[in-house]
């Protein structure tokens, strides 16, 4: 968007909500939802448009946070998406896996280290983010985040925006991203599985061998 209209016209924002798509729409718990973050990319942070949005949200029941470091906050959300959405999507289990499996925790931590290394190289200070940004909205152990919901429903995922972006930035900065590279290809393979690429029946059940 910034490339088309110039970033000076943009009030940067994102939302942290754990929602689930059902037949009648998206469902989420408003009480446990962290909410909407927004803010100016540079001073003045308490701009007129920030105050205007603040006034709009007043008395709506929404949760929101105005931040002076929206860039770091956006990276904090990106880190959560990469580290928590993706490993559970590969395994096909609820988010409780990160507490119950040292192996899932190790994969998550490996992805996190790569995100933090790229952020540091870009001059993003993740220590500046709000305390609530270090975690997602409270959910049950059985919760399935958006990437796994996409796979469950046979939809293509946002993996290009997550590990795909990490691979691209890592290459530009000379930072290895092996966890993200493996994760990227695994999610892409799961998309192919949903697309029927691996349905070996009839004439498609050809002879093959290991290489």
What are these regions (language model features)?
Residues 1-73, 77:
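Rossmann-fold dinucleotide-binding core
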Residues 58, 97, 105-211:
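NAD(P)-dependent Rossmann-like dehydrogenase/reductase catalytic/cofactor-binding core
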Residues 27-40, 91-100, 144-153:
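Helix-loop-beta segment of a Rossmann-like dinucleotide-binding subdomain
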Residues 6-8, 63, 94, 125-127, ...:
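Short coil/loop linkers at secondary-structure junctions
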Residues 27-31, 82-84, 196-197:
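Short, hinge-like loop/turn segments at secondary-structure boundaries
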């Amino acid at each position: 968007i910034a490339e088309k209209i110039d970033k000076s016209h943009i009030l940067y924002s994102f939302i942290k909500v754990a929602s689930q798509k059902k037949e009648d729409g998206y469902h989420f718990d408003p009480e446990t939802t962290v909410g909407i973050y927004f803010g100016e990319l540079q001073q003045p942070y308490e701009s007129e448009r920030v105050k205007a949005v603040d006034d709009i949200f007043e008395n709506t029941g929404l949760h929101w946070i105005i931040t002076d470091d929206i860039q770091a906050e956006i990276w904090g959300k990106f880190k959560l998406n990469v580290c928590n959405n993706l490993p559970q999507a590969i395994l096909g289990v609820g988010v409780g896996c990160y507490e119950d499996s040292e192996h899932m925790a190790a994969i998550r931590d490996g992805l996190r280290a790569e995100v933090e290394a790229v952020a540091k190289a870009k001059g993003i200070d993740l220590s500046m983010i709000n305390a609530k940004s270090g975690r997602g909205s409270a959910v049950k152990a059985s919760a399935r985040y958006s990437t796994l919901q996409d796979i469950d429903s046979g939809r293509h995922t946002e993996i290009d925006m997550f590990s795909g972006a990490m691979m691209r930035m890592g290459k530009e900065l000379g930072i290895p991203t092996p966890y993200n590279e493996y994760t990227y290809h695994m999610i892409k393979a799961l998309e192919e599985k949903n697309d029927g690429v691996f349905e070996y029946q009839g004439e498609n059940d050809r002879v093959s061998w290991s290489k």
